[in-house]
């Protein structure tokens, strides 16, 4: 129902802020990180209204991209508004988009309230749906590079399945690309490198 509210931010609390519009009505907006806003400053805050059986709640966002990401997260099974705000509070939208693009569920578990199953669900539900956000926000998404060396590709896939992040695997590929080895040999070399 609401797209945004222009007004004076009158109060800032740990979980929400109050913004008064020009007619004097104060709106309580739950936000990911209220301290990104300044008190007693006219602001343009994007808003999402969520209506539940026994409550109507307004959620505020610093920009359209944050609101877009919030709505995408709400489409993930097991993610509600509070969980979505907790994820957004980390202020790592680029990391989230990159993790989804690279199927890196282990990276997503660093967000509050996101366990292994929820992280896998986020990747499953949002894969390919955040590309337009990355483009509009000017984010660069680091994807795991591919290789023609099948043994190396198998080793890298095995390392990812063991829970190593896509970022670590990409670094390993550059280190191991100059070697000729078997899949097992690549895995041993990679593990030695990771333990250092």
Curated annotation (Swiss-Prot):
Subunit structure comment from the entry: Homotetramer. Forms an RuvA(8)-RuvB(12)-Holliday junction (HJ) complex. HJ DNA is sandwiched between 2 RuvA tetramers; dsDNA enters through RuvA and exits via RuvB. An RuvB hexamer assembles on each DNA strand where it exits the tetramer. Each RuvB hexamer is contacted by two RuvA subunits (via domain III) on 2 adjacent RuvB subunits; this complex drives branch migration. In the full resolvosome a probable DNA-RuvA(4)-RuvB(12)-RuvC(2) complex forms which resolves the HJ.
InterPro entries: DNA_helicase_Holl-junc_RuvA_I (IPR013849), Hlx-hairpin-Hlx_DNA-bd_motif (IPR003583), NA-bd_OB-fold (IPR012340), RuvA (IPR000085), RuvA_2-like (IPR010994), RuvA_C (IPR011114), RuvA_C_sf (IPR036267)
Ranges in coiled-coil conformation: none
GO function terms (MF aspect): ATP binding; four-way junction DNA binding; four-way junction helicase activity
UniProt xrefs under SUPFAM superfamilies: DNA helicase RuvA subunit, C-terminal domain, Nucleic acid-binding proteins, RuvA domain 2-like
Function: The RuvA-RuvB-RuvC complex processes Holliday junction (HJ) DNA during genetic recombination and DNA repair, while the RuvA-RuvB complex plays an important role in the rescue of blocked DNA replication forks via replication fork reversal (RFR). RuvA specifically binds to HJ cruciform DNA, conferring on it an open structure. The RuvB hexamer acts as an ATP-dependent pump, pulling dsDNA into and through the RuvAB complex. HJ branch migration allows RuvC to scan DNA until it finds its consensus sequence, where it cleaves and resolves the cruciform DNA.
Protein name: Holliday junction branch migration complex subunit RuvA
Pfam families hit by this protein: HHH_5, RuvA_C, RuvA_N
Description of its domains: Has three domains with a flexible linker between the domains II and III and assumes an 'L' shape. Domain III is highly mobile and contacts RuvB.
Family statement: Belongs to the RuvA family.
Subcellular location: Cytoplasm
GO terms for cellular component: cytoplasm; Holliday junction helicase complex; Holliday junction resolvase complex
Top-level taxon of the source organism: Bacteria
Region of interest: Domain II: 63-141
One GO BP: DNA recombination
Keywords carried by this UniProt record: Cytoplasm, DNA damage, DNA recombination, DNA repair, DNA-binding
Region described as Flexible linker: spans on this chain: 142-146
Gene assigned in the entry: ruvA
Domain III as annotated region, ranges: 147-196
Region (Domain I): 1-62
């Amino acid at each position: 129902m609401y797209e945004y509210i222009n007004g004076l931010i009158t109060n800032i609390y740990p979980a929400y802020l109050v913004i008064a519009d020009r007619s004097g009505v104060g709106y309580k907006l739950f936000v990911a990180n209220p301290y990104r806003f300044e008190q007693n400053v006219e602001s343009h805050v994007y808003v999402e209204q969520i209506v539940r059986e026994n409550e109507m709640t307004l959620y505020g966002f610093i920009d359209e991209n944050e609101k877009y990401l919030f709505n995408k997260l709400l489409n993930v099974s097991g993610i509600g508004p509070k969980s979505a705000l907790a994820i957004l509070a980390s202020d790592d939208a680029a990391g989230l988009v990159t993790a989804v693009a690279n199927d890196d569920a282990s990276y997503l578990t660093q967000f509050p309230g996101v366990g292994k199953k929820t992280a896998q669900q986020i990747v499953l539900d949002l894969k390919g749906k955040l590309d337009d956000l990355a483009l509009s926000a000017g984010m660069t998404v680091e994807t795991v590079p591919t290789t023609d060396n099948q043994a190396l590709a198998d080793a890298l896939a095995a390392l990812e399945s063991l829970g190593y992040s896509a970022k670590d695997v990409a670094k390993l590929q550059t280190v191991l690309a100059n070697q000729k080895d078997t899949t097992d040999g690549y895995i041993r070399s990679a593990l030695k490198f990771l333990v250092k």
